[in-house]
Amino acid sequence: MDIQKQIVDILAEATGEDFSDNMDQELYESGIMDSMTTVQMLLTLQETFDITVPVSEFNRDDWNTPNKLVEQVKKLQDEE
């Protein structure tokens, strides 16, 4: 399964919404995600992709759309 599909599935589980047709949907300003869903999503991303997301370096602007999530996961995988 590719990263994009896995992230869409993780977001669907965390938010109850399907982003497969709208990968540029703003997650925070639209109210879809809050701090609790963010923590849940980050923990799942770390477990699924065997990456570490330093909370101190987490910037919502870098993680605020499904496409940006894909970019950040790929970036972290390259660093690991």
Swiss-Prot record:
Gene Ontology terms: cellular component: cytoplasm
Designated name of the protein: D-alanyl carrier protein
Residues covered by the Carrier domain: 1-77
Functional description taken from the UniProt entry: Carrier protein involved in the D-alanylation of lipoteichoic acid (LTA). The loading of thioester-linked D-alanine onto DltC is catalyzed by D-alanine--D-alanyl carrier protein ligase DltA. The DltC-carried D-alanyl group is further transferred to cell membrane phosphatidylglycerol (PG) by forming an ester bond, probably catalyzed by DltD. D-alanylation of LTA plays an important role in modulating the properties of the cell wall in Gram-positive bacteria, influencing the net charge of the cell wall.
Keyword check for Cytoplasm: yes
Gene3D superfamilies, per the entry: ACP-like (1.10.1200.10)
Family indicated by similarity: Belongs to the DltC family.
Keywords: Cell wall biogenesis/degradation, Cytoplasm, Phosphopantetheine, Phosphoprotein
Keyword Iron: no
O-(pantetheine 4'-phosphoryl)serine modified-residue sites: S35
PTM (free text): 4'-phosphopantetheine is transferred from CoA to a specific serine of apo-DCP.
Protein source organism: Lactobacillus delbrueckii subsp. bulgaricus (strain ATCC 11842 / DSM 20081 / BCRC 10696 / JCM 1002 / NBRC 13953 / NCIMB 11778 / NCTC 12712 / WDCM 00102 / Lb 14)
Lineage: Bacteria, Bacillati, Bacillota, Bacilli, Lactobacillales
Pathway assigned to this chain's UniProt record: Cell wall biogenesis; lipoteichoic acid biosynthesis
Family matches, as SUPFAM superfamilies: ACP-like
GO MF annotation: an example: D-alanyl carrier activity
GO BP term, pick one: lipoteichoic acid biosynthetic process
Subcellular location: Cytoplasm
Any single Pfam family the record assigns to this protein: PP-binding
